[in-house]
């Protein structure tokens, strides 16, 4: 397996774990919509995304957004926005 395949394989493992967390959390929220803030906070998925020399004001949820989009592209999660808040839930067959 080359480096690209290994990295993409690991991203798929991360996406699966994120999906499982969303599924486990759904019962605690109305209509199963899990707030993205809950997901990012519980899994500590906010990171600083710029080099140390650059300036950024705090951690951002870019990594979570990428992985959540991977799940959305595979039709494994649904996304909903209410006001400024984002929510996710698993797609049920």
Task: Put a short name on every predicted segment.
Residues 1-8, 51:
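Short, Lys/Arg-enriched N-terminal segment that forms or immediately precedes the first helix
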Residues 5-33:
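Positively charged, polyanion-binding regions of nucleic-acid-associated proteins
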Residues 28-33, 44-64:
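Short, positively charged loop/turn segments that connect secondary-structure elements
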Residues 38-40:
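A short acidic, leucine-rich amphipathic alpha-helix
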Residues 65-69:
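Short, hydrophobic-biased segments on the C-terminal half of alpha helices
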Residues 72-81:
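A short, conserved structural fragment
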Residues 81-93:
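Short, cationic-aromatic polyanion-contact patches
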């Amino acid at each position: 397996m080359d480096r690209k395949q290994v990295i993409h394989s690991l991203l798929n493992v991360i996406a699966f774990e994120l999906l499982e967390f969303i599924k486990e959390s759904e019962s605690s929220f109305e209509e199963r919509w899990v707030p993205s803030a809950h997901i990012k906070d519980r899994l500590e998925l906010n990171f600083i995304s710029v080099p140390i020399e650059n300036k950024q004001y705090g951690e951002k949820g870019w990594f979570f957004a990428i992985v959540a989009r991977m799940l959305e592209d595979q039709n494994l999660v649904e996304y909903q926005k209410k006001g400024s808040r984002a929510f996710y839930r698993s797609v049920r067959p």
